[in-house]
Amino acid sequence: MEYSDFELVRGIKNGDSGALDILVRRWYPRIYGYIFKLIAHEQDAYDLTQDVFVAMMQNIQSYYPWKKFDSWLFTIAHNKCMDFFRMRKRSVPTDDIVFDHPDPAPLLEETVTISVSVKDALAKLPTPQREAIILHYFHHFTVKEIARLTNTPLPTIKSRLSTAKKTLSKYLREDF
């Protein structure tokens, strides 16, 4: 039987460690992927993902069922990433960003070239624009949800997405 996030959170609040295990297994890959795409360092992404789930447990009593669980959890992840950037005050290295690709053997050379170009273009974006693109196109959040979870005005998110798309288009035109 598949439990909803709401049912699992209710179980966690009642001390059910099995519910916690299911919820972490369900959300760990998406949270790790989001963080890794933002900070581009495997060990830091692993550590921050662990921090997100620790913070989730510490704050689970403050989660209200009328909130979307994924928005609440991604807000925690966003805040952990912003704390990381503030503490480290470093830029994201473009050479370390990795995107999952299927087995490259059947891929045509042209497809590989395009994928690498998109990865490189995305890595050149400023962090706020890259984050908006990742949340919207990789994790399928709406513009309104992105604004809420990043605590950013809706017009700013729209602007970031628009600017990022134009910039990505420019970078990709230069490559081809």
Describe each model-derived feature in a short phrase.
Residues 1-30, 118, 123, 144-145, ...:
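N-terminal module of bacterial RNA polymerase sigma factors
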Residues 2-5, 91-115, 122, 142:
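Internal acidic/polar
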Residues 8, 24, 32, 42-59:
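Conserved RNAP core-binding helix
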Residues 13-14, 53-68, 88:
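Sigma70-family region 2
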Residues 33, 47-54, 67-79:
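Structural recognition of an alpha-helix C-terminal capping motif at a helix-to-coil junction
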Residues 35, 125, 130, 162-176:
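Short, Lys/Arg-enriched C-terminal cap helix and immediately downstream tail that follows
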Residues 61-65, 75-94, 163:
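Arg/Lys-rich amphipathic alpha helix in sigma70-family domain 2
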Residues 132-136:
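A short pre-motif secondary-structure segment
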